[in-house]
Amino acid sequence: MSVTKNTIPYNQYYQKRTHIHVYPVEFVVRTLLGNYPNLAMNQDSYFGSKLLDLGYGDGRNMPLFHNIGFKIFGLEISQEINRLACERLEALGIDAELKVGQNNCIPYQDQFFDFIVACHSCYYVNEGSSFNENLIEISRVLSTEGVFIASLPMRDNFIFNDAELLSDGHYRITKDPYGIRKGTIHKTFKDKDEIIEIFDPYYKDLSIGYINDNYYGINVKMWIIKATRK
C-alpha cells in the first residue's frame, strides 16, 4: 500500500466502484470466524478492539469488521479514496476513522492497534524502501500480543508475469490486467521458511496457509498469515 506515484490510477479505479454494497475477501472471513487446526483466534476479543484495515481499497472488509464489533480505522494512499469510502460507509451506517498514509508511514502512535489486517496490501513497497521497513512500521503501531493478519504474494502470482526483479524478492510490476499497478514495487515470498525468518524478530505464534486459485485466467497464489506481536 505504498504506491504514491500510482495515486491517480487508483483514484480513478475506485471512482468507478461506487455501488453501496461490497463483499469481504474469503480468507479474511475464514481467518476471523473460522475454526481450523493450525489457527488459534480468540473471537471473544473482537468486540471493542481497535482494528486497522491497512490499504483497505473499496472497504469491502469493513462491513464484516463492523458486524463483529471492531472499532474500525483505515489507511489508504489518497484522500479521494477515503472520501469515496466514507460515502459508502455512511450509507451503510458504519463508523470508521480513515487517514492517508503508507505501509512505511502509518500516522498513529506506538502500539495503538489491537488488530491489523493487510488484505493484499502490506507487500507494496515505496521506491528506495523495502518490505522490512514496512514490517517495522506495522509492528510499531501494533500492541504487544496484538494480531496481524495478512496476505503475501508467491512469485507465480499473476501480477508478476514479466515483472522486473530488483533485489531480495522485490519486483517492479510491468503488466497489470487491471491497469493500476504498473510501475509499483512488490515483495514476493518464496516459502514458509522465508516468511518465518522475516517475521520472527517481531512476531510469535505464526500460522501460515495459502491460496491457489485460477479465476478464468487470473492465477492468484498468495500466502495467508496470522501472527501475534511479541
Descriptions of predicted regions:
Residues M1-F47, I149-R172:
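Conserved class I S-adenosyl-L-methionine
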Residues L52, G59-C105:
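Class I SAM-dependent methyltransferase SAM/SAH-binding core
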Residues N104-I116:
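A short acidic, Gly/Pro-enriched loop at the edge of an enzyme's catalytic core
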Residues N126, L142-S143:
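Helix-to-beta-strand junctions that scaffold the AdoMet/dcAdoMet cofactor pocket
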Residues N126-E137:
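A short, conserved alpha-helix within the catalytic core of class I
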Residues I185-Y202:
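Short alpha-helix
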Residues K204-N214:
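Conserved S-adenosyl-L-methionine
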